[in-house]
Amino acid sequence: MALKPFADVPVVQWMEPTPDSQYHGTAVAWNGGRYIYWLRGYNSSLFRRYDVYGDTHQYLPAAPWAAQQGAMLALDPSRNRLWAIQGNGGTGFAYFDLSSLTWASVASLPAASSYGSWIVHTCSSLKSGANDDYIFYAPAYGSSSLYRYSISGNSFTALASAPAALGAGSVGVWVYNYDPDKILVIRGGGTTDIYLYSISGNSWSAFSYRPAAFGFSTGTHAVYDPDTNHVYICLSEGYRYIYRLNLATGEMEPFCRLPLPYYREARRLALVKVGDYKFLYVFRGYEYAPLAVWRIPVYF
């Protein structure tokens, strides 16, 4: 887009609101094309997709379990799937086939998912040479555990524990164009800590950034922009700000302010790129009106 910093401040646009109230467990993921798929959460199995072309929501087959806090979706473009964890203190783990629009359950999670739980898939369709068989799972909610799921083996392996317990608002993102060996992990639980997990070394290190002045907790979520090596981060519930972490410099900078606060433990962010246009979509995560979906143009 032919826009410039300062002269063209990012404009927050109101999109079609969700047909159902959002809450703990609302989880979104872009499929790389026309749709953002989303679990409603709110202790329900409702599943939808949002058409970024037509600004319209569509009902889809229900998830195999009720989703709540800790639910999350992860795209697997090489298999044309979305992987999903249940949250809600459950061990449900499944995938949604984007071709047949059907669900299939797989091995149960080795530890219950709840506040701060996350999954990361290292996909060779996103980065050549990545191990396409792996999904990493952190139960968080006071646990420092990390597991690796083998898709071919349908089994979990315990890995090195995080340096400290992960809490509500923890999230992991695979920063594959910055370093394909690393998963960036926001610790959550009200702390300012951010870690890097080395996939090859099965080891953890601190990620230094500035200013490290905000404690991430319930409601935090993050998405990665592989074009710029920025990570977009929403803060804890009750805030209106989206920040942006520059991985190359370690600087945490403001990106935009939303019209209203966002709430609940929702995986609310989706970064969508179609042609030369890129937008950050934000699902508010609140059970009361307006059931907002916003988008912000990303042009610098």
Each PLM stretch: what is its role?
Residues 123, 137-138, 146, 171:
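Solenoidal tandem-repeat scaffolds enriched in leucines and small polar residues
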Residues 33-34, 78-80, 131-133, 180-181, ...:
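Short coil/turn segments that connect the beta-strands within blades of beta-propeller domains
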Residues 217-228, 232-240:
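Loop/turn-rich, solvent-exposed surfaces of beta-rich toroidal or solenoidal domains
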Residues 3-22, 45-68, 92-115, 145-167, ...:
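Trp- and S/T/G-rich repeat-edge/linker motifs of beta-rich repeat architectures
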Residues 42-45, 88-91, 141-144, 189-192, ...:
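Short glycine/acidic-enriched loop and turn motifs that connect beta-strands
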Residues 21-29, 66-74, 114-126, 166-175, ...:
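Repeated scaffold domains used in trafficking and secretory/extracellular systems
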Residues 265-300:
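Blade-level signature of beta-propeller repeat domains, shared across WD40, Kelch, NHL, RCC1
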